[in-house]
Amino acid sequence: MAPRVIGILRRFLPEYLKTRPSLTPAQWRAIRAITQCRTPALGGHRYACAPCQKETFAFHSCNHRACPQCGREATREWVERELAKRVHAPYFMVTFTLPAELRSAFFGPYAKAAYDIFFAAAAAALHDCLANPKWLGATTSGFTAILHTWNQQLLFHPHLHVIVPAAGINANDKVLCGKSNTFLVPVPALQAAFRRHFRSRLKALDWQVDPAVWRIDWGVNIQPFGSGAAAIKYLGAYVCRTAIGDGRIRALEGDSVTFAWKDRSHGNAPKILTLPGSEFIRRYLRHVLA
């Protein structure tokens, strides 16, 4: 049988808990769901065909977002809903990535507030820029933001993907549509607005940050995505699923786990990474937020 995440958890979790005994309630729920998924622990259904008398039994799925066996149906439904919402306008994928110096805010007592600030700052920055009459002039605009907390090596790398139509409504209730398929707003302007809104909201937290972080460029990327369908389908693979699927697991040998990853800095070159089993679990569980 091909190696799977469920097997990794079953093999290495006892050793992992010796050094990291305190997991969050959300992480415990995820572990329980994943290890019981499609097993007798969750029961099942027996399907019978009256004409041919054939019977088939299927165990229940856990449907937990962190389970690599689940999420396909929820993903399909999400993609269909988002495709149906599209407007007739050029679409863009905007990605917001926080500087590494700010990532410690996403641990411990500040975590929920930090994620709230991340979403709010990105949304406010987009609204500001889309409202500028030099670019679109829409005082009312809408978009879909999706949080990813991982990179291909399962390291903590929080970033937001936002699907943005170049469309909105101005102060006179007139519907506006961007005329360019390749330009939404200037990246430097969006970077500055994102940084400004994040900083103003962070002041509410009793958390110290190196002042130099406010003087560097923040990671903002804008890519044109035509009708938006490709962006929705791409992000749909992650909305109802987790950081790594069973298909990327290459080997489970001894004390190690080997999995495939793509090196984004070298043109998505395929690579292989081997980690101790306990380190794989640490990285995997880091992306279980709720």
Regions found by a protein language model. Name each.
Residues M1-A290:
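Beta->alpha loop/short-helix hinge microenvironment recognizer with preference
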